Amino acid sequence: MSLNKVILIGRLGRDPEVRYMPNGEAVCNFSVATSETWNDRNGQRVERTEWHNITMYRKLAEIAGQYLKKGGLVYLEGRIQSRKYQGKDGIERTAYDIVANEMKMLGGRNENSGGAPYEEGYGQSQEAYQRPAQQSRQPASDAPSHPQEAPAAPRRQPVPAAAPVEDIDDDIPF
């Protein structure tokens, strides 16, 4: 038995870029920063930031492209996937990407482009979009290929206001 699951909460380092593959499916790419802080042996505060390349597909990609913005806080679930490429120096390298299949926008209006503080989850919808497309394959024709229309995204549910948390470091590395 094996498991490949990644859960991240971080801030977008750039606005998402959405492209469309020849078959009409959307692909979205962006980066997310996660940080951890600790005190070293001398009592000095140390921070390390990791950057993660995120890829999303289909309807989730379109939603991310529409609603996520640089600096916004986001919760992501997915899997890690490696890919090999050749660097400018000719050496083969390996990159690791997170293929996200669930997303929740965290924070309020200023964090992303939503209204009051909302939490939006689209993970289950993503799986629903994969299945019908696989079942309804049609022979190729001269007409352009379009993804199957999917049900509307879940309604926004207000998140109750949380009590302020002490000692939060709001330094964003971008």
Curated annotation (Swiss-Prot):
- A Pfam family it matches: SSB
Is the Nucleus keyword given for this protein?
Answer: no
List where Polar residues composition bias occurs.
123-139
**Motif Important for interaction with partner proteins boundaries:** 169-174
Task: Report the superkingdom from the record.
Answer: Bacteria
**What InterPro entries has UniProt attached to this entry?**
NA-bd_OB-fold, Primosome_PriB/ssb, ssDNA-bd
Q: Which stretches make up the SSB domain?
A: 3-107
Gene Ontology process terms (BP): DNA recombination; DNA repair; DNA replication
CC terms in the record's Gene Ontology section: nucleoid
For this UniProt record, the keywords arranged alphabetically read as follows: DNA damage, DNA recombination, DNA repair, DNA replication, DNA-binding
Q: Which GO terms describe its molecular function?
A: enzyme activator activity; single-stranded DNA binding
The keyword DNA damage is annotated on this UniProt entry: yes
Q: How does it assemble?
A: Homotetramer.
NCBIfam families in the record: ssb
Summarizing the function annotation, the protein's role is: Plays an important role in DNA replication, recombination and repair. Binds to ssDNA and to an array of partner proteins to recruit them to their sites of action during DNA metabolism.
Name listed for the protein in its UniProt record: Single-stranded DNA-binding protein
Name the gene behind this protein. Answer: ssb
